[in-house]
Each structure stands twice: as C-alpha cells, then as structure tokens.
C-alpha cells in the first residue's frame, strides 16, 4: 500500500525519506510541495477550493504574496505573526479578531481515493503556543497548545472525488492536503500512508459543508459547517468524507450528482449521515411530511440494501426570534420530528442536533448566541460554532449508537473522542 515519508529543512540526506526545502512548491507531476499564493495563482486546479486545503487569501490580498517560506535544521516554516504585523503596519490599523494567522500548506499526490493516515512531526526550540492542524478541505484534525521540543500527532483523512461549487460535473481528487496554523507554523517530518477502515460520508447543506477559510485567518470570521469539525471528535479508526454543499435539499443532493459520488465510493460497513431541511422548507414539494420524508426514506432503503449504515441528523436550529415579543421562532421543528419518526420506523440512529442547538440558543438568547455564528448571520456557524455543533453530534453518536443492536453503529460510538476541549470566542 502507498506510503511516503518526508523530511523538511536542512537535515536532508536520510535514506527512504524525501527531502523537502522551502523552495519546493507543489507542481503537477512532482507529487508533493507547499501551496502558496504564487503557485495557486499559476495553477487553475489549485484555485478550486474543494480540491485543495480550502484556504485562500482575503480577496483584497489576492495579488499579494503572504506566505514567505523559510527553513532551518528543524524543518520548514513561515513567520505568520510577523507577516500579519507587516500587513497591519501597511494598512495602519490592526485586523479585527486576534490573533490572525497565515497557514503553512503542504500537498501530497496519492494513487487513489480512500483513507490515509498522516503522521506530522514538529520540532521547535521555542514554545509553539496554540496550533491548529487541518486536513483535506479544511477539516479540523488538531487544536491545542504545543511547547518547545518535539511534537508528533497522527490523524486520518479521506480523499474522495467531489462536485465543486460552481461546477456541474464530478472532479477526481487524489491529493492529501495539510494546513498548519500557528504564530510560526512549522513542519519537520511527515508520513502519509494508505489505510483501510470505515468512512463516515456526510450529505447535507451549508450548515454541514466544508466551508472555505480566508486568511489571515481568524476562526470567528470564517463560515464553517459542523461536518468539517466532526473529525476532531473521531479517533484514527474512522475517516470523514463531506459531500454537503450550500443550498442543497434532499432532492438536489441527488439530482446534482453529489449522491452519485457517495454511491460510488461507499462500501459495506461505511456510514452516511443525512442532515437536510433548511432549504427543503423553502420548496412546496419538499415539505416535512411530503417530499422531504419520501426522499429520506429512499436514501435509508438504498444504503441499507448495500450494507451501508444510514444515520439521520436533525437540522441545526437557527438563532431566530420574534420581534414582537422576543420569543424563539423554531422554523425547523417539523423537519426534526420527521427524522425522529423515520429513525424509529427503520431502527436507525437519529442524532438530535436540532434539540442541542436549540437549547444552546434558548439558554444564551439572541445576542449572546451570536458569537458562534458568522457575523450578521443567524443560520451559519463560524469555526467556533461548528466545533460546538460537531461536539453535540459526537455526543449524540455516543448516546444513540452505543449498545445498538447493529454492531456497526456500536463500533462508531467507540470511535468517538472528547475532541480538544473548549474552543470558544473571546469573552464566552
């Protein structure tokens, strides 16, 4: 099976390792390399976010170079804190959100779609502080504080074809992407190896999808679906493959080709999570007890027939309140109820994200719930909020799948972790 070992920086020359320096930018045919603003501008495929790390510069920096790679005996790195400070000096004012960071992005070609184990090593003579590691299409793999010395972390990612935003056809994807964010993000060594194991496929709308991240990055000002934070709550026995997209319904998910990708790659023993409702409710033919219910039934039956395990997720609650009396306005309760009914009918788990998210909004109130949503938005979470919602989903997996008569569901509950602790907006 496929395996590649990389050593970064000035300590090259070791047998069976591919030496990587700060000048090694990703190019077609090379098979690996860093992704910066320079080669992203030069290569069209690097501009399609779903085929890459999903990080890109804020639009007003699109013609500028922000990533200045360096190397030393401990690896390759960039001085994110200094580059952000330079941008602030240039503009004459600090950026909102603190601290903002520039990601160190590395890309590796792999021979086929599937699951890959990534082992990342960082060696630093100074405190690293807060570090975020994302894999694939900006899926959170690690969040924590790292001190001086050597830090090694192992994670799993899924590589799968996708229908990108703005396209009507399926694009093949055979690359592993890693993005490291810190004041001085660094990679010292990296191993990418093919592994077998179950995959959790996600089918949903904008509240689930892998949203892009602008940089200099701040988690409070990025749209983020809970699906891209879900890997933070699984161990390395299971991978997540997210095919959710903004604007999709139980109907358009099939008609626009997204379900075809899942049908092609899912195998017996895998899982498919379905969370819809936000867009179904806008269409007369997809009301809760009509087309919405019928479409979910069809998805359930099709997956059960091929040995894939369906799971329903009730739609995340909006932060919506009535102006006249300041009472909560629940726009999705009927859709959540249908999920619960179908779960009972077919004996499958229903993860009641609607109940958890509604409880959070009710406890916080309109204003205090806002920090976990994208600024000015009452439906879509930012990275903080998506991490919280993914935590609720993980909690539900533990509670609803543990002890299930189908061993595969119980196994999934065993793969759930506690994540990386609280990750809250400042002041929350």
Positions of the model-derived regions?
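N-terminal post-signal-peptidase region of extra-cytosolic proteins
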Residues: 101-104, 251, 255-259
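Alpha-helical cap/lid subdomain in secreted, periplasmic
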Residues: 257-387, 391-411, 415-418, 422-427
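Conserved beta-strand scaffold positions in the cores of enzyme catalytic domains, especially
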Residues: 5, 240-242, 347-350
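Glycine-rich, histidine-containing beta strand-loop boundary motifs that form or position
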Residues: 135, 204, 244, 276, ...
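Short, structured coil segments at secondary-structure junctions
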Residues: 135-136, 234-236, 306, 346
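Conserved, compact domain cores that house catalytic/ligand-binding motifs in diverse enzymes
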Residues: 33-41, 46, 194-256, 265-272, ...
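Residue-level detector of flexible, active-site-proximal loop/helix-junction positions
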Residues: 146-147, 207, 247, 317, ...
């Amino acid at each position: 099976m496929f395996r590649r070992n990389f050593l970064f920086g000035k300590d090259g020359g070791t047998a069976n390792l591919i030496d990587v320096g700060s000048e090694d930018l990703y190019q077609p045919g090379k098979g690996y390399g860093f992704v910066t603003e320079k080669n992203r501008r030069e290569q069209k495929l690097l501009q399609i976010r779903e085929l890459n790390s999903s990080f890109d510069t804020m639009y007003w920096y699109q013609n500028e170079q922000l990533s200045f790679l360096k190397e030393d005996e401990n690896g390759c790195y960039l001085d994110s804190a200094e580059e952000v400070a330079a941008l602030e000096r240039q503009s004459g004012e600090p950026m909102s959100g603190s601290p903002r960071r520039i990601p160190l992005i590395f890309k590796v070609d792999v021979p086929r779609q599937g699951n890959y184990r990534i082992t990342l090593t960082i060696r630093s003579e100074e405190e690293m502080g807060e570090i975020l590691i994302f894999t694939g299409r900006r899926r959170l793999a690690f969040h924590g504080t790292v001190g001086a010395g050597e830090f090694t972390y192992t994670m799993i990612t899924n590589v799968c074809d996708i229908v990108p935003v703005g396209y009507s056809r399926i694009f093949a994807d055979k690359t592993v992407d890693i993005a490291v964010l810190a004041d001085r993000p660094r990679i010292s060594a990296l191993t990418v190896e093919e592994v077998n194991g179950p995959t959790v496929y996600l089918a949903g709308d904008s509240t689930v999808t892998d949203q892009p991240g602008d940089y200099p990055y701040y988690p409070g000002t990025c749209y983020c679906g809970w699906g891209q934070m879900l890997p933070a709550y699984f161990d390395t026995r299971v991978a997540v493959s997210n095919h959710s997209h903004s604007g999709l319904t139980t109907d358009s998910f099939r008609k626009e080709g997204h379900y075809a990708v899942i049908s092609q790659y899912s195998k017996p023993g895998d899982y498919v999570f379905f969370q819809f409702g936000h867009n179904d409710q806008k269409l007369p033919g997809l009301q809760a007890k009509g087309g919405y219910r019928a479409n979910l039934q069809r998805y359930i039956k099709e997956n059960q027939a091929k040995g894939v395990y369906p799971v329903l997720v009730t739609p995340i609650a909006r932060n919506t309140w009535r102006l006249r009396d300041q009472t909560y306005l629940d726009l999705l309760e009927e859709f959540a109820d249908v999920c619960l009914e179908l779960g009972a009918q077919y004996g499958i788990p229903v993860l009641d994200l609607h109940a958890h998210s509604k409880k959070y909004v009710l406890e916080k109130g309109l204003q205090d719930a806002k920090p976990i949503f994208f600024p000015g938005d009452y439906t879509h979470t930012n990275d903080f909020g998506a991490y919280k919602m993914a935590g609720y989903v993980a909690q539900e997996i533990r509670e609803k799948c543990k002890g299930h008569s189908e061993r595969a569901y119980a196994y999934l509950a065993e793969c759930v972790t506690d994540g990386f602790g609280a990750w809250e907006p400042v002041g929350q």
